[in-house]
Amino acid sequence: MAPVVLELLRRPAHFDVKVAVTGQHRQMLDQVLSAFEIVPDFDLNIMTQGQTLAQVTTRSLDGLDPILAAEKPDWVLAQGDTTTTFVAALAAFYHGAKFGHVEAGLRTGNPRDPFPEEMNRLLTTRLATLHFPPTPESAANLKADGVGDDVIVLSGNTVIDALLEVAAKAYLPTDPLLSEILDDPRRMLLVTTHRRENWGEPMGRIGVAVRQIVDAFPDVVAVVPWHLNPLVREALTPSLANHPRIRLIEPQEYVPFVKLEQKSTLILTDSGGVQEEAPSLGKPVLVARETTERPEGIAAGTAKLVGTDTALIVAEATRLLSDPEAYAAMARAVSPYGDGHAARRIADALEIPRSETLT
């Protein structure tokens, strides 16, 4: 959302912007706010240790309710497929505000995979006034759900807006370890995994695959910014700890992580955002999931689904690291996710008067 916030702030004659954050993924949130110099007007700070999805839902709704009652916004915007995005749409509906869904229309077709994100998307679609799908495929998904053409704005993905801005900037790391990693001339396998459906044995298999890949290629270093979740670390530690060419590092702020993506040779991830970012940087992506709501990258040839099967992950990584033609075919494929102007299209659409009728 950062590019959208900044674009709206550049149009004070049209928009009085207030920014609310839930505090979900606190460390990552603070990093992005700092990188884009955004100061929230409201911080719900909803997260407590060990809370359930139901508690996240109710705490988010309780936090947003008085804000919307006091501010009486014309529009509420939220991005993505989190529970808090669905709650923002529901709160906007309760308060008679129009809701704009950024990154709308992503689908896997299975309401429980990913859980709860797919259902969050479906419910948010029903509540939204205006839909901003990032790709033609996601726009088609909305139309298949009965959403009218007049409330669909094909925007591109704001993730790419943010990525291209950061990637173009020079960066001098202050962390000696990060500086060492970025200066290492060897090929880098960048690994990120955190998704709920991969916790436990599936994530353990990913770890085994990473170790086998590194053992097979003496010129490859694996860099793993591992998630703070103890379940993630418990699953990965047996395979990834104590290897001289596997670097387990703390979660990175947004800007240094983009620099790691730029430095990498190959990326193995279960992250939706990384699936979108990597193709714009010319980096092949192996997707450690059984399904993806971002099939555009698969169709374009920038990404390949490998699931969490150790043998398949190793085989595909080996192919790309051994075959220059196979690697080049993925690295040169055109990114389907946007051109860096999504925020402008979203702001333009919001300037047009619209009714509050749900579609």
Named regions from a protein language model:
Residues 322-359:
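C-terminal amphipathic helix plus adjacent low-complexity
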Residues 78-79, 101, 131, 257-298:
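A donor-sugar binding/catalytic signature common to diverse glycosyltransferases
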Residues 117-130:
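Membrane-proximal helix-turn-helix segments that form the acceptor-binding/catalytic region
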Residues 101-115, 129:
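A short, histidine- and acid-enriched strand-loop-helix "catalytic/donor-clamping" loop
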Residues 13-59, 63:
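Conserved nucleotide-sugar phosphate-binding/catalytic loop shared by glycosyltransferases and other
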Residues 20-27, 127-201, 205, 306, ...:
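A nucleotide-sugar donor-handling region in carbohydrate enzymes
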Residues 13-14, 25, 30-32, 51, ...:
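Donor-nucleotide binding loops and adjacent catalytic segments primarily
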